[in-house]
Amino acid sequence: MYQHSVTVYDADGNLAKTIPDSVDLTAFGVTGHPGISKGAPVEAAYSKDGRFAYVSNYSMYGAGFGPEGSDECRAGDGTSESFLYRINMSTLAIDGVAAVGAVPKYVAVTPDQRYVLVSDWCSYALSVVDRASMREVKRIPLGPYPRGIVVSPDSSKAYVAIMGGRDVAVIDLRSLTTGWIRNVGGGPRHLVLDPTGRYLYATLNKDGQVVKVDTASGTVVGRVATGNQPRSMDISPDGTALYVVNYESNNVAKVRTADLAVTQTIPTGVHPIGITYEPTRDRVWVAIYTGAIVVLTDA
């Protein structure tokens, strides 16, 4: 389904290394999958100190793995569960794995560095992985198609977008119990918080909008149309702007958070899918589904 590698670029956009996703799971104490297994990388998140990257794999391929995942899967349909990889950023090699659910997608590291959180698309769940041991400590059922995750600055709560519905789950990271922000809009996919944790922003893939939610009350306080199928987004370090990729509009929208006004729209190429703000140079990196990367300078 995906090309089996992780590519690492330096800040100048030069390719530093291509990391194959082939692993010998037995070397990490995993049984039932002898020989070499391959993954299918989807998303990555970094530890606070930048020493490690954690990478989800849409599916695994090799001995002991069954049907590969698909976006049309259902919980309990037999889709094989997958693994989270840990990449050592000094050696640029995979040095740890953790078993998670079926078709893991988004990855987030809690600011206190205790957990790595993984949304399991086909298991309808959130995997909570202990970062120190690289072991799943709990799998929290959520409902169809969990996707984006963001964690509060104090690591007390995680917000999870449930793309198969209209809601956002709120996970208490101390008790690992679930609450809800209901009816934010159709197909919530990606989430970001402002630096204070006061406002939550969600892309609505189905509605073509971004919504702003007051986290204290769980109330939607604003919304803006950004384009067709807004997928991923990021927020500027000062919290004043959002950067949203619109998959079917083939562009990036810059949104002012104070009043949710679209201040700029930039063409990107066909099907922009991922985006991140690089704060040391004030640049926005955009991943295109066809395999290209577009780097924009923020003004």
Residue ranges and their predicted role:
Residues 1-299:
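Predominantly soluble domains enriched in secretory-pathway, periplasmic, or organellar proteins
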